[in-house]
Amino acid sequence: MSGGLLVAGTASDAGKSVLTAGICRWLAREGVRVAPFKAQNMALNSAVTADGAEIGRAQAMQAAAAGVEPEAAMNPVLLKPGGQRHSQLVVLGRPVAEVDALGYRPYKERLAAIVLECLDDLRGRFDAVICEGAGSPAEINLRSTDIANMGLARAANLPVIVVGDIDKGGVFAALFGTLALLDAADQALVAGWVINRFRGDARLLEPGLRQIERLTGRPVHGVVPWKAGLWLDVEDSLDLAAFPDAEPCPDAEPCPDAEPCPEARPASHGGRREVLRVAVIRLPRLSNVTDIDALRVEPGVAVRLATRPDELADADLVILPGTRSTVEDLRWLRRRGLAAALAERAAAARPVLGICGGYQILGRRIRDDVESGAGEVDGLGLLPVITTFDPVKLLGRRAATDAAGRPLTGYEIRHGRLTVEEHPDSAPFAADGVRVGAVAGTSWHGVLENDAFRRAYLADVATAAGRSFVPAFTCFADARQRRLDALGDLVADHLDTGALRRLLAEGTPAGLPFVPPGAS
């Protein structure tokens, strides 16, 4: 097998990222050396490769599904939206400019060459490359400069399958309309369809499946059922829109080397085990919300997003996550009354955790002539930290031990340089952070994925809240692998894998019909 495949979608959040990961997992289990690829990604959730390059979080997840190390070539162009309708342009893992929509256009020709070089490189080193499109391939206002969808497919001669989300409704219109808006050369690369997130008996779809095949002259390669609990690495605001209500995870993922947690000192409530409630403030420019994934699979922990002060009232822990625009989100917190609510929590010794940008916001002052141009502004003053923004972004994976001797790993993606000032009540937190009373902060993303550290911290939170809660021996890495296996199972069980193999080996079949707009 030697080839590539592009997974396009009728819209954002149609299921491209998950289907790409599932195909990678299925192929890897079949013994195929496979890599993911996304030419251009727009996301605030990013990951850091072993050599310190920044790529989209979804591509790192897909690489994990494929069983390979993520690298910059898998996502050569990353756009990270910020304030004032500008985005940070990251090329081959390094930030190169702040651009708006019009300012981005002059870069496209040079970026197209980089994209194709990266794809050629991957195709030379792997048996198969599964490419993920961006948004919809039928964005006709963008087609002339497209480097992520049909522009990529045509330049690299990639067969294309288009996935549509039936759970949102209108999937057949979306599939047919997508094809009809493409020109003849682009249509010639579209090899078939996948229906995603179907609830119910797939036999009920048969009349529609046969009709869309007749209308387009292209087969439906599978109907993927709706499946709860896949939570894997949300990428953007559309993913967060589907964030579940606060329900505790019911099943533990046992960690083979887990030891009893000495920090667990739950209050006595007659033996009843209570739920620990976590509220994550949904900042307007929230980034790397994947930091809370480890809590979402922790049995007995209920995680929800919050945007109002009253939504923090019953939370045992409030998390202030990362942000692409620290000063702007600090101002938003003040306007919404959330800054005052956090100060009240701190005064009442109720736990608050800041991660990266959230840690900076909890500090005393922020000096920012880089990200917002705001100069010096006061933070919330809950931690003795001064943040100074630097044009050079800190990128890298980190490893250390905390004050208790527990090994920690994480990663950094930030422009802010932090100075911890003297405070009579401060103590170290995690590997790099500080804690004053119930308020703590760290610059490291991924710190809660460390099982022993997470158990100890949740035990402290439970004690502060007076909850009868004992952390489970959850192994987050194993939980992630099980969910990646579930994606591979969905592909193996519900897609025409023989057709996928033929597309990878032979490309799009010749002679597929052209469907003009208005055809029926």
Curated annotation (Swiss-Prot):
Biological process annotations from GO: cobalamin biosynthetic process
Pathways per UniProt: Cofactor biosynthesis; adenosylcobalamin biosynthesis
Parts forming coiled coils: none
Domain of life where this protein originates: Bacteria
Limits of the GATase cobBQ-type domain: 275-453
Catalytic site: 356, 445
Pfam families tied to this protein: CbiA, GATase_3
GO molecular function, a single term: ABC-type vitamin B12 transporter activity
Keywords assigned: Cobalamin biosynthesis, Glutamine amidotransferase
Homology family: Belongs to the CobB/CobQ family. CobQ subfamily.
HAMAP family per the UniProt record, alphabetical: CobQ
Task performed by this protein: Catalyzes amidations at positions B, D, E, and G on adenosylcobyrinic A,C-diamide. NH(2) groups are provided by glutamine, and one molecule of ATP is hydrogenolyzed for each amidation.
UniProt-recorded name of the protein: Cobyric acid synthase
